[in-house]
Amino acid sequence: MKFKVRGIDTFASTGGRPFDKNKPLIIFVHGSGLSHMVWVLQTRYFAFRGYSVLAVDLPGHGLSSGESLKTIEEMGNWVGDVIGAVGCKEASLVGHSQGCLVTMECVAQHPEKIKTLTLMGGASAIPMNPELLRLAEESNPKAVDLMMDFAHGPAGHFGGHPVPGLYHLNVGSMIVQNKEIKDTLGVDFRACDNYKNGPEVAKKLDLPTLSILGAQDRMCRLKDGKILADYIKGSEVKIIEDCGHMMLLEEADQTLETVSYTHLRAHETQQ
């Protein structure tokens, strides 16, 4: 689905169903350098169960036009504008990695628009390894390889993708390298490295929140995810064992089950 946000063409996957602004809306926000493609299983599941879904491509990513936004604050404000751009008044948000910072900022800037929040592989701060940041800003493909290596747990390195013929590490690499690396991954990494407001923002959140953490996450470590959850009033925590940072791909079924039965229950009771 294509629509305009601030006059710029924006793409979002609707999970294979026509978008209906009268249904409860869930917006999925991808991580650094990625796109709507990482949410294929999640969007389809909810789209066929009574929800309207938008797995957005942030500006300059995937099939969205424009330049990549340079700060987490800008990205959060942009996600808030998406809600009105599609004719809705409120939404639930699901973010992964950098998308956690973005969705928290969206809640902070647009609290009246957000019903519930799901954070996958999140932390209150995501400082970047200087060498990885340098490689990404130089468009060196090694940055993508390193990110995918660190993002997956041990099991994710040995196959097991739910789609026959696909390999976990290659899926992310294909998405990132669809664009100039420095213009997406480089910009996103720099935005994460510069963002310092996470703890203060998290402490002010007051809405149903679920944190899904990978026990073997090497990018946003388990202990950092727990610290973030502790900052958020009433946050629920689900830990997925034998899983790294890319739980939405590595353990898609467990992740989906957790979101559907734990978190969106709160969404439904508020309707």
Regions found by a protein language model. Give the residues of each.
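Catalytic histidine-centered segment of alpha/beta-hydrolase-like enzymes
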Residues: 243-252, 256
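Active-site loop/oxyanion-hole signature of alpha/beta-hydrolase fold enzymes
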Residues: 8, 13, 40-48, 52-98, ...
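Conserved small/polar residues in nucleotide/adenosyl-binding loops
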Residues: 262-269
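Short beta-strand/loop motif that positions the catalytic acidic residue
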Residues: 205, 211-213
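Flexible "cap/lid" loop of the alpha/beta hydrolase fold
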Residues: 104-146
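Acidic catalytic loop of the alpha/beta-hydrolase fold
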Residues: 216-220
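Active-site glycine-rich loops that stabilize anionic/oxyanionic intermediates
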Residues: 31-34
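Conserved alpha/beta-hydrolase catalytic His-Asp/Glu region
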Residues: 134-204
